Amino acid sequence: EEVRRTLMSQYGEEKLYSGGLSVRTTLDPRLQQIGRQALIDGLVDFDRKKGWRGPVSRIDTAGDWGVALGGIETPSDMAPWRLGVVLEAQKTKAVVGLKPSRLQNGSLATEREAVEVAYDEIKWARSSSKKDNKSVGDILAVGDVIYVAPKDPANLSGAWMLMQIPEVGGGLVAMDPNTGRVLAVVGGFSFAMSQFDRAIQARRQPGSSFKPLVYA
């Protein structure tokens, strides 16, 4: 996105999209993917320590909960996270119905999927002021709309976790210290949620800007 913005300012929209430009960068796709995941993991871990802020929304599960979930907008770049609704809140697990995918014609898929989230993957959301939160039902309730994600994205039939979109933002820049080439740039948690690039557009504190030079 930063490359697009730079080219737009230098050449204009017409030359950018129809001028036949060939652009090469030093970005490494593998490191870019690793960097994005590292930033997301760090933001999520930090945000969890601040506590659970509650469900995204609440819906009635008596009817077709898939239709109700389908009406809730979600960022397009959240995969493998999925929006879901709590169908059962048992002592040791929650049964979560996942938001149906949309077909090419825009209609919702008729198939309804559900996954189980064990208490061990939910207990981080316990309130520190309530020592008796020892079951899923003490944290979640039927009808709660939440985010869940597979513990292993390559194994969707495995364990799933309760997730929460972090309020804190962040950015990441990875460079080769020998050549100065930029290998990865991550501007935030979700580009769909915010196009502000915290790695490029944010103004860092002078002390923080000087640290890479000191530690190098």
Stretches with model-predicted labels:
Residues 1, 10-204, 208-213:
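Periplasmic/cell-envelope proteins involved in peptidoglycan metabolism and beta-lactam response
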Residues 216:
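Metal-dependent nuclease catalytic cores in nucleic-acid-processing enzymes
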